[in-house]
Amino acid sequence: MAAALLLWTAGTVCAAPIPWQSQKFEYVADRKDIKEVLRDLGASQHVMTSISTQVEGSVTGSFNETPQKFLDRMAGTFGFAWYYDGAVLRVTSANEAQSATIALTRASTAQVKRALTRMGIADSRFPIQYDDDSGSIVVSGPPRLVELVRDIAQVIDRGREDANRTVVRAFPLRYAWATDHRVTVNGQSVNIRGVASILNSMYGGDGPSDSGTAPRAQDRRLDSVAPGEASAGRAGTRALSSLGGGKSPLPPGGTGQYVGNSGPYAPPPSGENRLRSDELDDRGSTPIIRADPRSNSVLVRDRADRMAAHQSLIESLDSRPAVLEISASIIDISENALEQLGVDWRLHNSRFDLQTGNGTNTMLNNPGSLDSVATTAGAAAAIAATPAGGVLSAVIGGGSRYLMARISALQQTDQARITANPKVATLDNTEAVMDNRQNFYVPVAGYQSADLYAISAGVSLRVLPMVVMDGGTVRIRMNVHIEDGQITSQQVGNLPITSQSEIDTQALINEGDSLLIAGYSVEQQSKSVDAVPGLSKIPLVGALFRTDQTTGKRFQRMFLVTPRVITP
């Protein structure tokens, strides 16, 4: 052992270098005890020293060299070993050298080796032997080195044991849904995927679903309606009169970003379906994730060292969504009035005012408008009028209210009507549904029984908003799906014919702007009979005393959709 220590002291490389205060050490000794000499060395260099009582010898001579070279000269001459642990320089005799074998149960030898090197404990003068197959470490050297290596190895091994220990944690959610939700809209199944189901799908534990495959984002139903048999006769009749008494405008399924399959969860997979990652121990199993609907929490059973990753992911999914107000106006304008409105068409938003006209009609005044076009009415009065051409001017405030003001003016002469003006609050990336339909049932005879076949007609407006932050500007992206239809007077086999029109569009607008959708016409017919009582019912000649009059109007239907952020 003494010979080995002499070989160890020959080198000067250590993981934690001694912080010498100077590069020159001058010293003169005459039969001075080696322990006092080493204390003088440490005191002059401001290095704490701990010298074993078993270190013996006397020093005589004059020395002028670096502190490190002087220490190595003394170690080689008197046969002691020194070790610096980062705080104290420890000097021990060769008889105090120790050797230890450390067995690891959980941690790997590579983990211990990296920790010793990173902490500055390993010293190249005292090589440490590692055996990966048996998980063993052999260390020999000064007592302090052996003690530190043993302590660090035990801490790492115990930490790995604690990390591999299976624990169960509950993560309560504040905004997202933990469980899957199923709702029915127009006879079709809507699946809203919860956080627990999303996590299960990431770890390969997506359980079977009782509703089939979830719809894709580009599907017609705007991420909400699962594929299935379409409801019969989805046509349309009258427009939306109000929100009261109809279906709930919002599906109770939660936020729109969690769309997918639902149903019972499958047990954790094994074998090739297990999660593999370079950062996770291959001996670990796939986590078990369940949802607690009572507390709206996600329960995770997994190793303790993975819980931090689960918590970070769940917190990112449980983000606070913005609250938006979707205001929709369904407007019917007669074609004659639409031509007039087209002449005096005025488009507004928060930044510009574009107006065209023939200069004869009264202009909608806006206090914030910068234009002051006027036309002479009579001989004395000057009134604001529409310009004879396109004029670009700035407007303070929103733009949709000016169009609504002109529509309200047309209502006075029965040339326009606002058939519905619903408002609904919804969450960011959650579809808002405004639906008003008429349903009637047609009996269909079967072999042993008769069934009722449902036919629905009406107006359905679905808006899926998403708040987009573009620098400091708030923009709103909308997916809009409109179904508008009516029951016609024509019949086939004593059944009325329904007509239906659909509109699918997307738009990215600034907050406060409106999206105007138009182009479909609606017919309104009325019949009146003027007759002479009694005489009009005489056979053959009764028609001479009766007048039948049928009048009809064609309306152009417009949809004005205005989103607004209530709570960002």
UniProtKB/Swiss-Prot annotation:
Keywords: Cell outer membrane, Hypersensitive response elicitation, Membrane, Plasmid, Protein transport, Signal, Translocation, Transport, Virulence. It is found in: Cell outer membrane. One of its GO terms (biological process) is protein secretion by the type III secretion system. Residues 243-257 have a biased composition (Gly residues). Disulfide bonds: none annotated. Its main location: membrane. Pfam families: Secretin (PF00263), Secretin_N (PF03958). Residues 1-15 form the signal peptide. Residues 203-292 are annotated as: Disordered. It comes from the Bacteria. GO terms for cellular component: cell outer membrane; type II protein secretion system complex; type III protein secretion system complex. Residues 273-284 have a biased composition (Basic and acidic residues). Component of the type III secretion system (T3SS), also called injectisome, which is used to inject bacterial effector proteins into eukaryotic host cells. Forms a ring-shaped multimeric structure with an apparent central pore in the outer membrane. HAMAP family: Type_III_secretin. The core secretion machinery of the T3SS is composed of approximately 20 different proteins, including cytoplasmic components, a base, an export apparatus and a needle. This subunit is part of the base, which anchors the injectisome in the bacterial cell envelope. Forms a stable homooligomeric complex. Belongs to the bacterial secretin family. T3SS SctC subfamily. This is Type 3 secretion system secretin. It comes from Ralstonia nicotianae (strain ATCC BAA-1114 / GMI1000) (Ralstonia solanacearum).
